């Protein structure tokens, strides 16, 4: 279970599931804010390793993934082939994906279901890529209307004391199209 996290500027993407020596089974990633992850190597937001045993029963929901473009990830949810093609019962739903995307960056592999995600980029690339690949009949393709993405502070560690940062700018406005758009 990976939940209630705030990650930013990581080399890799938001989530990487690595099967081996057995399958990754019944993993859940939820309630997380990811800002500019995949920044340095263009890693995908979500990478599901297939492997010999695969990723089975994975749920990725109610997360916000935001990235700004050049030099950052341009891949939403690809899978990676390691020894075999096993991906079963993977659900990606009720997420906000905000940032540009490249062609082929959404996995269309059998066993992955996408639904009720909000997908947006100001240049329209994320919407185009997702529409062409995800088969998400309930997707929303509008700006989620964050209050102010520059209103983010980092935490500190000084003299043995931790001060948490905030990401208040990623709250959505009261008339956001994301409100009531998710599956129950």
What is each model feature region?
Residues 162-184:
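Active-site and glycan-interaction determinants of carbohydrate-active enzymes
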Residues 10-11, 179:
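Flexible loop/turn segments at secondary-structure boundaries
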Residues 6-10, 24-169:
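Predominantly extracellular beta-rich ligand-binding scaffolds that present long acidic/polar faces
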Residues 13-15:
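Inter-heme linker and motif-flanking segments adjacent to c-type heme-binding CXXCH motifs
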Residues 1-2:
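Solenoidal tandem-repeat scaffolds enriched in leucines and small polar residues
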């Amino acid at each position: 279970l990976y939940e209630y996290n705030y990650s930013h500027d990581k080399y890799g993407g938001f989530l990487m599931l690595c099967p081996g020596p057995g399958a990754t089974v019944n993993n859940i990633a939820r309630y997380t804010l990811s800002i500019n992850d995949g920044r340095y190597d263009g890693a995908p937001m979500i990478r599901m390793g297939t492997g010999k045993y695969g990723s089975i029963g994975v749920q990725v929901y109610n997360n916000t993934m935001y990235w700004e473009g050049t030099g950052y990830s341009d891949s939403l949810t690809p899978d990676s082939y390691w020894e075999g093609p096993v991906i079963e019962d993977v659900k990606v739903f009720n997420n906000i994906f905000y940032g540009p995307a490249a062609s082929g960056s959404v996995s269309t592999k059998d066993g992955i279901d996408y639904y009720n995600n909000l997908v947006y980029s100001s240049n329209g690339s994320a919407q185009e890529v997702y529409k062409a690949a995800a088969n998400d009949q309930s997707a929303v393709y509008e700006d989620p209307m964050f209050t102010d993405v520059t209103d983010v502070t980092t935490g500190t560690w000084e003299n043995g004391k931790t001060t948490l940062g905030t990401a208040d700018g990623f709250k959505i406005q009261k008339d956001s199209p994301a409100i009531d758009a998710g599956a129950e």
